[in-house]
Amino acid sequence: MSYIDNPWRGSGLAHPDLDPIPWPSADAAAPRSIMSQTFDPAPTPWVSHDGLAHTVGVDQLWIKDERNRMGLGSFKALGAAYVIACDAAKGDAKGQGYVTASAGNHGLSVAAGAQAFGARAVVYLADTVPEAFADRLRAKGAEVRREGAVYEDSMAAAAAAASAEGLRLLSDSSWSGYSARPHRLMEGYCMLMAE
């Protein structure tokens, strides 16, 4: 797999916090190798969508249907589960607690990864996230905690819980001082792109 360099990456962004952010990985073999040891490695299908193609004015439009990946019904199945799989490959996941905030799909990946590797998942949800989604997380073994009216509130609570309870923060967002895990998480999606 290869990628195209963005000639504007970093331009106009003279901020020291951006310096340590690594270039994106294009290594699809690593996620496939690690994930196929635990999860079904079968590629997800491409689905033609003629109606949408017509609406947007193109001849053909194909959509990568990720709903069945890992049985999650989620388009973000690969990311967090891959991070936990990498920890497991180093013998560092079993019994570990992972904490995150989610407004949807990311939490399912954390829960599935934790469940697969004998870890614990704690997922913070804002009060506005439907209870049906909380039930889906619980069905994957996650402990669900409610905090705040918006995602940012639940993210702050997850970060605080990581510190207070010795849990491993696994966010799909990055910020100054927290980029290694999100970078690894994004590497997991290389598997999807290679398909």
Residue ranges and their predicted role:
Residues 1-195:
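PLP-dependent amino-acid enzyme catalytic core
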